[in-house]
């Protein structure tokens, strides 16, 4: 018996809606990363995009446990000497809650060419509304 290798056009893509209300950021991001990669499907192939689309609503209601709101955060470098910047999660969630979820999911995806393709399939919105009703997304409970 030969090993099955999926081709990108033969794996059907589904749309899922996830409500982030009261969900811990890390656990939510881990589940989203699995769905984006397609690891929940029997046709999973590591070098092929077999994942589904994910819509996250109510991004501003995601929670962090413990003291992570002030202690942890998003770190980046401006490429100038002494240009290391740090934004605590408290400030990031106040101003750009959708960015916090995108950063967490991006860190849980493989660091290769497919990561940008996976990230294009992630749609994060503040509030309960989203413009993807035409795709008839399934509600996914996490």
UniProtKB/Swiss-Prot annotation:
InterPro entries: Ribosomal_uL13, Ribosomal_uL13_bac-type, Ribosomal_uL13_sf. GO terms for molecular function: mRNA binding; structural constituent of ribosome. GO terms for cellular component: cytosolic large ribosomal subunit. It holds the Pfam family Ribosomal_L13. NCBIfam families: rplM_bact. This protein is one of the early assembly proteins of the 50S ribosomal subunit, although it is not seen to bind rRNA by itself. It is important during the early stages of 50S assembly. This is Large ribosomal subunit protein uL13. The lineage of its organism: Bacteria, Bacillati, Bacillota, Bacillota incertae sedis, Caldicellulosiruptorales.
């Amino acid at each position: 018996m030969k090993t099955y290798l999926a081709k990108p056009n033969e794996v059907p893509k589904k749309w899922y809606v996830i409500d982030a209300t009261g969900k811990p950021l890390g656990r939510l991001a881990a589940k989203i990363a699995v769905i984006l990669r397609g690891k929940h499907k029997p046709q999973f192939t590591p070098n092929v995009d077999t994942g589904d689309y994910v819509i996250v609503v109510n991004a501003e209601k995601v929670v962090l446990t413990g003291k992570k709101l002030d202690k942890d955060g998003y770190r980046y470098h401006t490429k100038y000497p002494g240009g290391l910047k740090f934004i605590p999660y408290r400030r990031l969630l106040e101003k750009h809650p959708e960015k916090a979820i995108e950063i967490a999911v991006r860190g849980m995806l493989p660091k290769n060419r497919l990561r940008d393709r996976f990230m294009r399939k992630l749609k994060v919105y503040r509030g309960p509304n989203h413009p993807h009703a035409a795709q008839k997304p399934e509600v996914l409970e996490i």
